[in-house]
Structures are given as C-alpha cells and as structure tokens.
C-alpha cells in the first residue's frame, strides 16, 4: 500500500467516527459506520500477507452484515413509529435487531468469533484502532438508545462475554489474541452497566482505551507478537517492560492502579440497582482474565531467559523515546487518586 494513503485512511476513520457520534438521524449514523469500515480494511490488509487478506475479508463480511442489520432495524422503527431519530427507538423488534447488530460490530458474545481472528491478522497499530477507535461509534449508538434496550439481554451477553473472554484467553500465546479476548471481557463490564449508568459505561470505555493503547504501543515498540518475544525483550528495554507490567496489572483491575476504578464503580452501581448476584458473578469471572494478565506481566519482567551473549551493548541499546506511550502508561497507572472527583461527576 502506498504510504501516502495511510494519513487519508486515518482521517477517514476520524471523519466516520465524528459523523456517527454527532448525528441524530439513523441514515447519517449508518453512513459514518460504513466510512469507518471502508477506511480500516486497507489498513488491515496493507502487508498483503495471506493472513492479513483473510482478516480483512472476515472483517468486511461481518461488518457488512451488522450494518445491514442496523439499517433494517432503523427502517423497521421508522415504519412503526414514523421517527428516524436515534433516541426514539421504541419498537421492540427494532430494539432487538439493533442490540444484535451492535453486538456484532463490538464483538460481544455470542457474535465474537470474528474479532480474535481479525486482530491476529492485523498489524499491531491497526489492531489498536480495531480495539479502541472502531468500537466508539457502535458504543455511542448503544448509549443513545440505552433507555430502550432490554437490561436482561444485555446482562446475559455481558456475563457471557466476561466469562468467554477470560476463559479463551487462558491458553493463548499470541499477544494480539490475548488482547482481543481482553477486549471482549472488558466489553462485558461496559455492557452490564450501560442501561443503568451510561456515563459510567462511557468512563469505563475511556479508561479501557487509555490502558489498551498503552499496551499496544509498548508491544509495538518492542515488536512483541508472542510471549517468547516479550520474554527476550527485557535485556533491551527494561524500563518499558516494567511499565508494560504495571499497565497489564492495571488492565486486570488490581488496586491501586487506574483499572481498579471502573470495576469498583460498576460493582457499586450494580449493588445499588439490587443486582448483587450479577455483580458477584462478573467480579468472579474477571479472575479468569486476571490469570492471563498476570502471565503476561510475569513474562515481561519477572522471568529472564539464559543469555549466552556477553556483548554489553544490548543492555544499553538506545531506543528513541516515545512521548505518547509514556503519557498513556502514566495515565494507566496513576489515575486512581482522581477517582473521588470522577465519582462525584458520575
């Protein structure tokens, strides 16, 4: 792919996202989703590797089906109510179809099958876009229609996503697949609270985006596509590996790191809504995710493979500093002290 095309595609992603999140009309929102889909496909397949082309094909087919469902849902609602306004989703069939369509776009269980495979076939920075930016427009549609959605259905999908994301990530060795199942698990936390507190769901997504971006950028810096590559990178980038360990623990939701805050607030809100069994279930299921985060952290810092080379330069290999990675990692680790202020806002 021509390198000059990359900025155009990234700008198209920004344009599509802006159109979707700022529109109140279903057709405009659908147009933004389609712009996003068409812009990300060349970024997925730019390496021309057969796996990348396969990932792009899977992504296109899945997103095309989801977009058709979004359009069909909005048309059904307009037929029944005469309204094209996104917030006026009142028809029960339309609500069900929209929930299924957005679940496909986000990769929620039981429509998650495409997401790990597409992420595994994509470059690390494209995988970052798929895990963060590409989830924002569909999530915005869910937030705008949250009052019309079925809480029981979303709770069931959320618990299933948290369980499957943790369970399937246990035996993975590829970092992109681990982060894909991590994304599915985090989407479960967002989905379970979305109907009861949309602001808290949005806060959880923002913090997830910050932490996941820090992990992807750190992995891209050390070129780690699997656990063994993380294992041997310590001798070259010890500071970055230590930071990566802390960000992974933050993603796991361990105090006193940033990732603990949204899970704490979600469990508190679920308890207020008299959903204590659901709060207990999702908290217990998140322990599955904790295991593979700990395994990643263990490989990144605690283990050190036998090193037969006596060449000292590898211990002092200079890497160009990355300011965005440093900022995102700092936010991923140090935001918890601000939680009382954030809680007051929410």
Curated annotation (Swiss-Prot):
Cellular compartment(s): Mitochondrion inner membrane
Enzyme Commission designation: 7.1.1.2
- In which broad location class does this protein mainly occur, judging by the first location in its UniProt entry? mitochondrion
Catalyzed chemical reaction(s): a ubiquinone + NADH + 5 H(+)(in) = a ubiquinol + NAD(+) + 4 H(+)(out)
Top enzyme class of this protein?
translocase
How does this chain sit within the bilayer? Multi-pass membrane protein
Q: Check the record and name the InterPro entries matching this protein.
A: Complex_I_Subunit_2, NADH_DH_su2_C, NADH_UbQ_OxRdtase_chain2, ND/Mrp_TM
A Gene Ontology biological process annotation?
mitochondrial electron transport, NADH to ubiquinone
| Residues spanning the membrane | 25-45, 60-80, 95-115, 124-144, 149-169, 178-195, 200-219, 247-267, 274-294, 326-346
**Per UniProt, which keywords does this protein have?**
Electron transport, Membrane, Mitochondrion, Mitochondrion inner membrane, NAD, Respiratory chain, Translocase, Transmembrane, Transmembrane helix, Transport, Ubiquinone
Instruction: Please give the Gene Ontology molecular function terms for this protein.
Output: NADH dehydrogenase (ubiquinone) activity
Q: Which PANTHER family match?
A: NADH-UBIQUINONE OXIDOREDUCTASE CHAIN 2
Q: What does this protein do?
A: Core subunit of the mitochondrial membrane respiratory chain NADH dehydrogenase (Complex I) that is believed to belong to the minimal assembly required for catalysis. Complex I functions in the transfer of electrons from NADH to the respiratory chain. The immediate electron acceptor for the enzyme is believed to be ubiquinone.
Protein name, entry field: NADH-ubiquinone oxidoreductase chain 2
Lineage in the entry? Eukaryota, Metazoa, Chordata, Craniata, Vertebrata
């Amino acid at each position: 792919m021509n390198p000059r095309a990359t900025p155009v595609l990234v700008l198209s992603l920004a344009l599509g996202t802006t159109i979707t999140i700022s529109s109140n009309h279903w057709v405009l929102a659908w147009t933004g989703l389609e712009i996003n889909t068409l812009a990300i496909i060349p970024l997925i397949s730019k390496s021309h590797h057969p796996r990348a082309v396969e990932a792009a094909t899977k992504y296109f087919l899945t997103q095309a089906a989801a977009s058709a469902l979004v359009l069909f849902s909005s048309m059904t609602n307009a037929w029944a109510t005469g309204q094209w306004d996104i917030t006026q989703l009142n028809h029960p069939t339309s609500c069900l179809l929209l929930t299924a369509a957005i679940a496909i776009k986000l990769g929620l269980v039981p429509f998650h099958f495409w997401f790990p495979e597409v992420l595994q076939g994509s470059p690390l920075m494209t995988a970052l876009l798929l895990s963060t930016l590409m989830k924002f427009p569909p999530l915005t549609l869910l937030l705008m229609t949250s009052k019309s959605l079925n809480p029981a259905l979303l709770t069931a999908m959320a618990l299933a996503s948290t369980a499957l994301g943790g369970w399937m990530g246990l035996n993975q060795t590829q970092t992109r697949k681990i982060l894909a199942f991590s994304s599915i698990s985090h989407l479960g936390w967002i989905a379970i609270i979305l109907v009861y507190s949309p602001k808290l769901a949005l806060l959880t997504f923002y913090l997830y985006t910050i932490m996941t971006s820090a992990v992807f950028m750190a992995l891209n810096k050390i070129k780690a596509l699997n656990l063994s590559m993380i294992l041997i990178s310590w001798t070259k980038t010890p500071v970055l590996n230590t930071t990566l360990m802390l960000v992974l623990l933050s993603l796991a939701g361990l105090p006193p790191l940033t990732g603990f805050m949204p899970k704490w607030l979600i469990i508190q809100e679920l308890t207020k809504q008299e959903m204590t069994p659901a709060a207990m279930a999702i908290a217990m299921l998140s322990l599955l995710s904790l295991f593979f985060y700990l395994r990643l952290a263990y490989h990144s810092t605690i283990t050190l493979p036998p090193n037969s080379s006596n060449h000292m330069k590898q211990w002092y290999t200079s890497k160009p500093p990355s300011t965005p990675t440093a900022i995102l990692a700092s936010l991923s680790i140090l935001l918890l002290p601000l939680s009382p202020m954030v809680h007051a806002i929410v």
